[in-house]
Amino acid sequence: MNTLTVKSVKERLQEVRDESDPFLAQCEKDPRKSVQTLLEQWLKKHAKEKALKEQWLNMTAYERLSSKKGFRLIAGVDEAGRGPLAGPVVAGAVILPAECEILGLTDSKKLSEKKLEEYYSRITEEAAAVGVGIVHADVIDRINIYEAARLAMVKAVNALTETPDYLLVDAMTLPLDIPQSSVIKGDAKSVSIAAGACIAKVTRDRLMAEYAKTYPMYGFEKNKGYGTKEHLEALQAYGPTTIHRKTFAPVQSYC
């Protein structure tokens, strides 16, 4: 083993795919500190990859169960933007191919903006179909946020280029003639729902960044329409915009 240079050990470790590989045992016996560091790095990376694969397996349980029942085009549906004081509620619907594997995809609230953008790109590239539904503030005020979120989800499903034969929906039942399951906290339990949530959130965040150009004083590019201190101070100083939800407190007090 000592006949191998540290560079050679590093290159060889990059080829190792399984923890049962005898080369790892050789590395353990190598007295060189640099080799031990390389081994430790490999073990950490492998453990992380293993955990991500286990997470993926757990989060495809609903999809595998639906597939066993004979369903092939399974769409995950979720929304973003129920709580903000301004902006639309946006829904995403995604059909992922059975062979698709996007490791690390999970509840969008646990992912950084950078990671969400990365997953958004992968989903749009690898998905069999992606649909988006948008319901704006005036409709939210007219029919209430719950119904608006449901309407956005229906729009997202109808926007899919492939017609799904089964739906996995985050905590809601949709008025569609398609078999479906409502999954509580679905974006943490189903990869399809997590994909829908990612599409919804990134789409909405981008919309709010565009609105910020029209209404720069509210900080929409940062707060996404939520009631931050900056947003509330601007609301008090300038009043509500056309994208504010007039039935939401405290917006209604400035109307």
Curated annotation (Swiss-Prot):
Q: Name one Pfam family in it.
A: RNase_HII
Which compartment or compartments is the protein found in?
Answer: Cytoplasm
What GO molecular function annotation could you give as one example from this UniProt entry? RNA binding
Q: What does the cofactor section's free text say about binding?
A: Manganese or magnesium. Binds 1 divalent metal ion per monomer in the absence of substrate. May bind a second metal ion after substrate binding.
Record-linked InterPro entries: RNase_HII, RNase_HII/HIII, RNase_HII/HIII_dom, RNaseH-like_sf, RNaseH_sf
Annotated positions binding a divalent metal cation: D78, E79, D170
GO biological process annotations for this chain's record? DNA replication, removal of RNA primer; mismatch repair
Q: Enzyme group, top EC level?
A: hydrolase
Cofactor(s) required, per the database record: Mn(2+); Mg(2+)
Q: Report the EC code(s) recorded for this entry.
A: 3.1.26.4
Keyword line: Cytoplasm, Endonuclease, Hydrolase, Manganese, Metal-binding, Nuclease
Q: What is its main location?
A: cytoplasm
PANTHER family for the chain: RIBONUCLEASE H2 SUBUNIT A (PTHR10954), RIBONUCLEASE HII (PTHR10954:SF18)
Stated role? Endonuclease that specifically degrades the RNA of RNA-DNA hybrids.
Identification of the protein by name:
Ribonuclease HII
Classification from the root reads: Bacteria, Bacillati, Bacillota, Bacilli, Bacillales
